Amino acid sequence: MNVITTVIKSRHSVRKFKPDPVGDLVIADVLECAARAPTARNAQPWLFGVLKDKTTRSKIADLTDNGKFIAESPLCFAVFGEKNQEYYLEDCCAATENLILGLQAHGISSCWVAGDKKPYAEKVRNLLMVPEGYTLVSLVAAGSPEEISITPKKEMKKIAFFEKFEKE
């Protein structure tokens, strides 16, 4: 295995973090990773929020349905996309994955919390004073893992096919 596949295969969603802060150099590096994601027509329709303040993270956690753990994470990223760009969702999801893999490469665990289709998306945008025209695509809680729970992945034969799909 090479370093990239090792990082990808070692990544797991973590919802319980140590209180240790994530360093500014790591944050800058993972933002650069996110900004280098592939994007349709080079639109780069993203805006990245870096949320270190516990009060802000707690307010966001209160707005979410499945992201209450954001309040206890030492860091959260908010990824927004320009709604007027046709492929903002695909582009911003690619950026979110790059962000998560960049964190993992630095030994920082994370958990992606959905945003785009959630009723709280507009409330988060307003809370963070993000301009109209952007919509929340994802929230990513991040930090050093306190607890890692590994769930098994589906068998490859159940999720992949070659040439054409054939029912078993």
Language-model regions, residue ranges each:
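Acidic, surface-exposed loops and disordered segments
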Residues: 1-168
